[in-house]
Amino acid sequence: FTIVLTDMNNFTERKPFVSYLSNNEIKFAEKFAARHDLEVIKPRNLRISKTHKQVIWASSESLLLQDLSIKNSKPFMIDYLSFKKIKAKSTLLKKCFSKKDSGRKVLDLTAGFCIDALEISYLGYLVTAIEKKSWLYEFTSYCLKNVKQKEIENSVNRIDFVNGDSLDLIDNYSDHEIIYLDQMFDHKTDARAKREIQFLRNLDFEEYDLTRLTKTLKNNNFKKIIYKSALHS
């Protein structure tokens, strides 16, 4: 069980385990875990873990996520077309973006799986999506590179996916007109959330530092800031 301490309110963050589906992939899993400061766990130990059972199955062929605490769960990667909102004509997110502004640059500060970034780029925007967690960045990069559906290939190509702290990097993107921020971890009890989103919510990431963001934005001239949050927040 791995815990990392953050500076914000003495927050403790839970990290996923790394494991393997075949003994032939042990070395690959170990290298993946070392790159991202994660803990490797044997499959049999994962199933009896008393802390949590969220895992990245790492192999030379694929990267898959699974939460074994959920009954009948299966390993998965991101199937972007299963998120119908990406191609939907009208969604709450799409209403925030005018078709007249298509082609402009958007800076997504909380990329995650790049699901919202892909929905925005599907409208024709150029999206720079920044993800802080290196393991999540590598997993999502793998999923984006393996998109086979022609109807969203162009949208994927309009995403510039970056690994780093968005608040450290924001000054590098002063040419972007729109800032997008999703506090996706606010609504943890939503049973309707897809397994992909629930996987991240169950890891109890630290909340985005809005105070630091406010100070940073004072030094920039972005034309629009779109902040997505649960209604109760």
Where are these regions (language model features)?
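Conserved Class I SAM-dependent methyltransferase catalytic core
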Residues: 210-233
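Short SAM/SAH-binding signature in class I
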Residues: 176-181
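Conserved SAM-binding loop of SAM-dependent methyltransferases across substrates and taxa
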Residues: 113-125
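Conserved SAM-binding motif I beta-strand of class I
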Residues: 126-131
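Mobile active-site "lid"/loop adjacent to the S-adenosyl-L-methionine
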Residues: 184-212
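Conserved beta-strand/loop positions that form the S-adenosyl-L-methionine
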Residues: 109
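S-adenosyl-L-methionine
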Residues: 5-104, 132-175
